[in-house]
Amino acid sequence: MPLTGPVIIAANHESYLDPPFVGSSFHRPINYLARENLFSNWLSGPFLSSLNAVPVDRGGGGAKGLKIILERLMDNNAIIIFPEGTRTHDGKIKSAQAGIGLTIIKSRAPVVPVRLWTYNACGRHRRMPKLVPIAVKFGHPIHFHSLREKAGTCPRPELRNLYQQATDETMAAIAAMRPVMDRA
């Protein structure tokens, strides 16, 4: 994990435990993304703001959130993104949201893939965490130099394919990781 400069931390999303487990693993300030409506809650709003969270409109009007994310990355910050956009319903990795590739290509920040196994401890349908083993695994940074170079010269209609390729490569890197406890 780069200790300085911009970095996107891209992780699968299994439970409410994911942001603190990922964020507490780094020795630098982290910015988070959070559903916009959580900021209007009297309890979660101030808490999320204190964590440098970026409000994201999950209804599709994400241009404002994207602008804030890119600004924070330009200021050499680290930001955690959950490409799936929401927690899994069944513990399996879901497909990523459309804007992730755009964020990756435009930011020019390296992407650190992270795989979490927290579903059994506090999955979507669980109110209280269960004391079971969890795992968090960090991959090597992905730089996307060639995709970013192509994006700078390709015709506009081809950009969507490059964004999708960045998204697919990120999700494949996350899905390919296996927990340490699986090793003999």
Where are these regions (language model features)?
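Generic signal for short, ordered secondary-structure residues
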Residues: 1, 26-27, 48, 82-83, ...
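Short, Lys/Arg-rich amphipathic segments at extreme N-termini
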Residues: 1-4, 176
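Catalytic core of membrane glycerolipid acyltransferases/transacylases, capturing the structured
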Residues: 3-61, 68
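Non-catalytic C-terminal accessory region of glycerolipid acyltransferases
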Residues: 64-184
